Amino acid sequence: MAGVRQHGWRAIPAVCSEYGADTLPDRYRSDGRCLLFWQQAGISALKQELEVKTPYRAMNHPVIGVVTKADLASMEQISLVKSWLREAGAHNVLVTSAVNNNGVTELFALLHTEEGCC
């Protein structure tokens, strides 16, 4: 439009919870197919995130739940978090640990299938 000055800007997806907002752009895919993020969160934050009306919510897309840092948790804690992720809408729940490389290969394999593709 003539006479209108356009300012350059770039939208950065943010994950908001009761603990604050996470806006690190390298934690997200920006191709519109999938929003991947990792963040320490309790079930209240997960439920709150699903209730937020944003273009980044899951809607009718598949949801993958990932339990991270499994090497630091007990089996009871991992089981509890897996149930929270299922309650929050995750169809696939994977348990990972980067320290001993457990579950990482399975996560990447799932992300490269039609089932896991968002």
Curated annotation (Swiss-Prot):
Gene Ontology biological process terms, A to Z: biogenic amine metabolic process
Residue runs in coiled coils: none
InterPro entries, per database record: EutP_PduV, P-loop_NTPase
A GO term for molecular function: ATP binding
Pfam name, any one: PduV-EutP
Superkingdom assignment: Bacteria
Record's miscellaneous remark: Encoded by the CP4-44 prophage.
Protein name in UniProt: Protein YoeF
Species annotation: Escherichia coli (strain K12)
Organism phylogeny: Bacteria, Pseudomonadati, Pseudomonadota, Gammaproteobacteria, Enterobacterales
Gene designation: yoeF
